[in-house]
């Protein structure tokens, strides 16, 4: 364990958690990065806080397992929201999301890499499990 980040923006069903107030930066392989967990990437302030640490990358672990209607509503909204954070901050963003079905819930990802211009430069196919490998420049 090299550090801890607590999700800043909680969903209604996450009231059992305490939202985080700190935005630590981490370093691995010479890359300085910060974390925005799932819903955090819908808000400019969390991405800006990462940029303010001097990071070059936002890492976004996500668990977008939702009821089918909600999943369909969000299916094409994840990458545009994340792309906006890249354009606002000039940072790269890597998202790692779940995929598959569990009971009445479904997840389509996306697991992707976005450049500072907000362009998706690598992505796993939606609905397909896999491992995405990308070398940051």
Q: What spans do the regions from the language model cover?
A:
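Active-site catalytic loop in hydrolytic enzyme cores
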Residues: 1-57, 61, 67, 71-80, ...
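Conserved beta-strand and immediately adjacent loop positions that scaffold enzyme active sites
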Residues: 1, 22, 110-111, 130
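CN hydrolase (nitrilase-like) catalytic-core segments centered on the catalytic cysteine
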Residues: 42-129
